Regions:
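ABC ATPase NBD coupling module
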Residues: 1-18, 42, 47-51, 165
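Short coil-to-helix segment of the ABC ATPase nucleotide-binding domain corresponding to the Q-loop/switch region
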Residues: 30-38
Length: 253
């Protein structure tokens, strides 16, 4: 990109990148169908082809039946769905989303996060998602980059950042996170014992929140198993209770 000419950058932007912003930036005089098809018209694609692709994107974001509505006739969440459909119409290789849900009320915001997770499970795009909400980042991301003063100070999985913050800033940034929803059984397990094979089993990747009630109720350790079913450790009810109560900020059981 640094070596590309202005013309090359325009072509890359038109054909390889999709973008969604906090403000929907829909053209008010165009219908939903026309808004979604608009970037394809900029590419010079014929009307029949661009409208066919626009219909596909509208169906993908569950706006069937609203093709001929204008933006003013849609709710905020529906308008953002139009923005998402428009950004995907060009079939981008990289999808940039800059605080796309920040302007929505909490209920609609969560609904749109769920919709994004569904779309990604279908599309398998490379997504760069910008947010100031760490809970949102944890829910959506495989990997998170935390920036301060324009500099990336740590990159890792949500679990990495919560369990092993690189700086005091990252530790403060993640301090109020519900750790039980982020940390896995692997993060809290201790070594396996001779009795581990006869214990209730939990997957190493399972989030603590998914089995916390069960292990506390049982008052017995659970065996932690890897992807192939082998026992790789043991997690105690006390370790889970300490996590839930905030007494244990470390990773050991």
């Amino acid at each position: 990109l640094l070596k590309a000419s202005e013309a090359e950058l325009i072509e890359i932007r038109r054909h390889k990148m999709g973008m969604v912003f906090q403000h929907f930036a829909l053209l008010p005089h165009l219908t939903v169908l026309e808004n979604v098809a608009f970037p394809l018209s900029i590419q010079g694609i014929g009307r029949a082809e661009r409208e066919a692709r626009a219909h596909q994107m509208i169906e993908l974001v569950s706006l069937n039946g609203r093709e001929h509505h204008f933006p003013s006739e849609l709710s905020g969440g529906q308008q953002q769905r139009v923005g998402i459909a428009r950004s995907l119409a060009v079939e981008p290789e990289i999808w940039f989303l800059d605080e796309p849900f920040s302007a929505l009320d909490p209920l609609i915001r969560r609904e749109m996060q769920t919709e994004l997770i569904r779309l990604q499970s279908v599309l398998k795009k490379t997504v760069v998602f910008i947010t100031h909400d760490f809970d949102e980042a944890i829910r959506l991301a495989d990997r998170i980059a935390i920036m301060k003063d324009g500099e990336v100070i740590q990159i890792g999985t949500p679990e990495d950042l919560v369990n092993n913050p690189a700086t005091a800033y990252v530790a403060e940034f993640t301090a109020d996170v519900n750790r039980a929803k982020v940390l896995s059984a692997r993060a809290l397990m201790g070594p396996a014992t001779a009795k581990s094979g006869g214990l209730e089993k939990v997957a190493a990747k399972a989030k603590i929140a998914s089995f916390a009630a069960a292990i506390v109720d049982s008052a017995k350790p659970f065996a932690v198993v890897g992807d192939t079913g082998e026992v790789i450790g043991e997690i105690s009810p006390r370790a889970v209770i300490n996590l839930l109560s905030g007494k244990d900020r470390g990773a050991g059981a």
